[in-house]
Amino acid sequence: MKYNRIYINSRLAENSKIELASDHHVHYVKTVLRLKVNDGLRLFNGTDGEFLAQINDIGKNNLSVRLKEQLKKPYTKSTLTLAVAIIKQDKLMLAINMATQLGITKIIPLITRWCQFRSVNIERLTKCVIEATEQSERLTPPIIEKAITIQDYLKKNNNLMLYANEHEKEENSILRISSSLSNSDITIIVGPEGGFTNDELELLASYKNTKSISLGSNILRAETAAITAIAQVRLLGSHCEEIA
């Protein structure tokens, strides 16, 4: 039997009792899932892993469960970061949802010259990634950082950074640098609708740890470019291991 999953940001251990008192969790279990006392579900987080739980009691504003068995143990892996320019909210939510399903570990909202917006709703994005984490059977939701300018982000980041460049030669694809992907912490940088400015492209090219990549001959929307690049990196690099 396949049990529903719920992300819990608190300590989990076998045979422990957990109280769920948030409005979201109580509504989800009682109203959406319609679970009853003695029904099972799965609780998880990236620190402790995933556990099979049994509902002991359901109150008006809370419910209690007991963790019966550990189903998955936590583990670590290389970091795969998506630094994506801030685009329209519905498109950004789509990109982040898909990125979470594909195993991204960190999300950086980037402020670039041609961004339509300069801030994001972190609370809403967090809800989006938790839902995608629950759905995709991974343990750890991606970390979402505050919006930052592309200039400041490049200054502080020293891992391998791949930036999608529609002006790049088609043969300079991710496949060409696949040997650099193994066991590396990688950042994928995607610009807004309209791409990067010439100054931003020059800035990106000036760093030794950046590589310009082509995603093919077609011009892709920002959200499509992000998903395409992540999928290619996970397929060709060590990041194609089981999603954490």
UniProtKB/Swiss-Prot annotation:
Keywords: Cytoplasm, Methyltransferase, rRNA processing, S-adenosyl-L-methionine, Transferase. InterPro entries: Alpha/beta_knot_MTases, PUA-like_sf, RsmE, RsmE_MTase_dom, RsmE_PUA-like, tRNA_m1G_MTases_N. GO terms for cellular component: cytoplasm. It is found in: Cytoplasm. Its main location: cytoplasm. CDD domains: RsmE-like. GO terms for biological process: rRNA base methylation. Belongs to the RNA methyltransferase RsmE family. Pfam families: Methyltrans_RNA (PF04452), PUA_4 (PF20260). It comes from the Bacteria. It catalyses: uridine(1498) in 16S rRNA + S-adenosyl-L-methionine = N(3)-methyluridine(1498) in 16S rRNA + S-adenosyl-L-homocysteine + H(+). Specifically methylates the N3 position of the uracil ring of uridine 1498 (m3U1498) in 16S rRNA. Acts on the fully assembled 30S ribosomal subunit. It is an enzyme of class 2 (transferase). One of its GO terms (molecular function) is rRNA (uridine-N3-)-methyltransferase activity. Signal peptide: none annotated. Its EC number is 2.1.1.193. This is Ribosomal RNA small subunit methyltransferase E.
